[in-house]
Each structure stands twice: as structure tokens, then as C-alpha cells.
């Protein structure tokens, strides 16, 4: 195995693939739990984050760490905490991400610009959005806007339950903790769809540790950075990834089809824990009603890719 090289004070691209190549980000709950864990650990361990982009079955980040040990401890700790919460929600055990994680040092401004474009353009390449900043989970839109995906939130005029939730969220953040699935489910059950999106933006803004100014410094301005992302998708030759030319929109399609079938949010989140027989039934159902390829449906349902059905 190639020995990992970490250069103190330099940007590094870190890539994580799920252990069985299965989907782990099914809903906004998964993204918010991951993000608040990630940001809490970055803040506690002094890691600078230039870019973060969780995708349905993998994640990209560009970070600056003081040492190899600091980077490894950071990645291992947030990965363990997220796996714990994700598994507890689904009554499962085990690792979520493959080990070891992939990383590559980026030395010089050109290399950093290239990998920032690559990381942030992943959702564009996977046909989820037309522009990197339109994907909520690149967090680019939060640089100069605290509510880019919801209506402005006026705390003093919010309903009583919303104010109570905001107070609880602030306390959680001040205590250095992260948001859990049970907290999100409780809040969402008492809020309207509009309020729920406001709360999601509020949580992201409160925990966000991305060093936008440092990322922007490689381009001169925020707008110049975005234009660079629009013009060049970037590249990565030092980390091995399994690429295909298919869109990730099929995972959202699978969710919509199952929702139309009558599956609740709780039932959807339990998909990875279903017995194989039930997964097989859903496998053929999704193949007949979406454009997803067999391997993509298997990844969505957490069926081994080499299993013949």
C-alpha cells in the first residue's frame, strides 16, 4: 500500500467511499447529522476545511491539517461517530466508510484550485445540479447567505415551537455537540414544510466551519471562484475512484417511487436493514419503475453488488 504523505499547513484532498458502495445519504436528516458531526470535530481538532461535498455514496473534502496524525484522528473520529448514529437509527452495526480513506496533498495554488473545482463539481458531474452552488451539500451558497434554500427566518416572529427548537439548537452548538436523528425527527414533526427548510438552513449556518475566505484567496473573489468552477470541473489523478457515466438522480427517483408506493420516511430509512427477501422485491419494483441500472438499485438497497438476483 502506498504510504500516505501529509504536508503540514498544505491543502489535502480527502476521499471516502462507503464500505459496500451503498447509499448512506438518503434524506436531509442523514446530511444534517453528518454535517454537524463533521463540523464539531473539525472545530475541536483545529482542522481547516476549504471544501466539503457529501454525495449519496461517497464524500469529498479539501482540508488543511497540522500533521498526519491530526488528519487521521479527525477523519476516523467523525467517521466513527456518524457510523454510530447512522447504525443506531437503522439497528445495524459496522463501519460505513472504507478503510483506509484516500488522501492526496495539493502543493501550489494551481493544484489547490484544480481540486477545489473537482470536489465542488461532483454533483454537477453526477447530473444532480447544473452549477456547484445549486447543490445544497457543497455549502457554497452559504458563503454570503444564511438561508439560501429557504425563506428568511425572523426569530422574533417565529411560532413558539420554532423558537423553542432554535433555542435547543443553539445550546447544542454552544456545548460542542452535534444534532441527532431523534432531535431532527421531533422538530420536523412539529413544523411546516417551510419552517423545516428554514430550520435546516439555520442548523447549517450555525455549525458551518468551512473557511470560505481561504478557499476564495486562491481566486481573488467569490464570484471569480464560482466562474472558475463553472468553466472547469477539475480533476484528480492521485486518488483511485470508481467512476461511471451514470447520473445520481436515480437515487432520488428511487425514493420518490417508494414514497408513492406508500413507504413512510421511517420505512425508507430502514431500507438497509431489511431482510434480503424484502430487498429483492423492492429491487425488481424499482428496476421496473425507474431508469436506474441494476448496480445502482443494489447500492440504494444495500444489496451486495456481486450477488446474482
Predicted segments, located by residue:
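Short Pro-Cys-Gly-centered "Cys-loop" motif that presents a nucleophilic cysteine in a tight turn
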Residues: 1-51, 65-309
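Short beta-strand->loop micro-motif that forms the acidic, two-metal-ion catalytic signature
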Residues: 58-66
Amino acid at each position: 500500500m502506498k504510504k500516505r504523505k501529509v504536508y503540514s499547513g498544505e491543502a489535502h484532498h480527502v476521499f471516502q467511499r462507503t464500505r459496500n458502495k451503498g447509499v448512506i445519504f438518503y434524506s436531509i436528516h442523514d446530511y444534517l447529522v453528518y454535517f454537524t458531526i463533521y463540523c464539531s470535530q473539525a472545530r475541536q481538532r483545529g482542522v481547516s476545511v476549504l471544501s466539503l461535498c457529501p454525495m449519496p455514496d461517497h464524500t469529498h473534502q479539501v482540508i488543511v491539517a497540522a500533521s498526519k496524525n491530526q488528519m487521521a484522528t479527525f477523519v476516523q473520529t467523525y467517521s466513527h461517530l456518524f457510523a454510530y448514529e447512522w447504525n443506531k437509527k437503522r439497528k445495524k452495526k459496522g463501519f460505513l466508510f472504507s478503510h483506509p480513506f484516500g488522501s492526496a496533498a495539493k502543493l501550489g495554488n494551481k493544484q489547490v484550485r484544480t481540486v477545489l473545482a473537482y470536489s465542488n463539481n461532483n454533483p454537477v458531474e453526477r447530473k444532480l445540479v447544473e452549477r456547484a452552488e445549486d447543490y445544497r451539500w457543497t455549502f457554497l451558497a452559504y458563503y454570503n447567505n444564511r438561508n439560501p434554500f429557504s425563506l428568511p427566518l425572523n426569530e422574533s416572529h417565529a411560532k413558539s415551537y420554532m423558537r423553542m427548537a432554535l433555542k435547543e439548537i443553539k445550546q447544542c452548538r454552544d456545548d460542542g455537540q452535534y444534532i441527532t436523528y431523534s432531535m431532527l425527527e421531533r422538530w420536523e414533526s412539529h413544523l411546516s414544510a417551510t419552517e423545516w427548510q428554514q430550520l435546516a438552513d439555520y442548523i447549517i449556518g450555525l455549525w458551518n466551519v468551512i473557511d470560505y475566505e481561504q478557499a476564495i484567496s486562491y481566486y481573488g473573489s467569490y464570484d471569480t471562484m464560482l466562474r472558475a468552477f463553472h468553466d472547469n470541473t477539475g480533476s484528480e489523478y492521485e486518488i483511485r475512484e470508481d467512476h461511471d457515466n451514470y447520473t445520481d438522480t436515480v437515487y432520488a427517483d428511487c425514493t420518490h417511487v417508494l414514497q408513492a408506493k406508500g413507504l413512510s420516511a421511517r420505512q425508507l430509512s430502514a431500507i438497509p436493514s431489511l431482510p434480503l427477501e424484502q430487498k429483492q422485491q423492492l429491487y425488481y419494483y424499482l428496476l421496473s419503475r425507474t431508469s436506474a441500472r441494476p448496480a445502482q438499485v443494489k447500492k440504494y438497497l444495500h444489496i451486495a453488488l456481486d450477488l446474482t438476483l
